[in-house]
C-alpha cells in the first residue's frame, strides 16, 4: 500500500507483541481510520488488540473501530498505529490467537462478548 503520509523517522521501542503464538496467524495490510484512535502522548494512536470493521476486499478504504449492530469486527489490529495525521497503514489479524495479558486494559475492554462472537472461529482470545 502507498504510504500516504510520506516517510518519517521516529525512534521507538519494540512493538507490543499481542500474539499468543506468533507462528500460527494470518494477517493482512489495511488502512486504519483516525476516528478509531485514542489520545496518547500528544498523538492519536489505535492500540494493538483493537477490534476493527472494514471490507477485506477493499483494504485501501480505512477500517474503523467495531461497534454493536452497525460495524461487526472482522479482525484485530496487530500493532499500535499512529493516526495523528489521518488514516495510516496497519496490520489486521484475521486468523490467530491473541494473548489478552499483552493487550492494555482499555483496549481489552473493547473485546466484548459480541466481538468474540463476531470473530469466533477466526481469532481466539487466551490468557497465559
Where are these regions (language model features)?
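Surface-exposed, low-hydrophobicity beta-strand/loop segments enriched in small/polar/acidic residues
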Residues: 1-128
Amino acid at each position: 500500500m502507498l504510504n500516504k503520509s510520506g516517510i518519517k523517522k521516529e525512534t521507538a521501542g519494540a512493538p507490543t507483541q499481542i500474539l499468543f503464538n506468533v507462528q500460527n496467524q494470518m494477517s493482512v495490510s489495511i488502512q486504519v481510520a483516525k476516528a478509531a484512535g485514542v489520545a496518547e502522548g500528544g498523538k492519536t494512536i489505535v492500540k494493538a488488540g483493537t477490534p476493527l470493521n472494514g471490507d477485506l476486499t477493499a483494504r485501501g478504504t480505512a477500517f474503523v473501530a467495531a461497534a454493536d449492530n452497525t460495524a461487526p469486527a472482522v479482525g484485530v489490529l496487530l500493532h499500535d498505529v499512529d493516526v495523528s495525521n489521518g488514516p495510516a497503514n496497519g496490520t489486521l489479524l484475521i486468523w490467530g490467537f491473541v494473548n489478552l495479558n499483552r493487550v492494555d486494559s482499555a483496549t481489552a475492554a473493547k473485546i466484548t462478548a459480541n466481538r468474540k462472537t463476531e470473530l469466533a472461529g477466526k481469532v481466539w482470545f487466551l490468557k497465559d
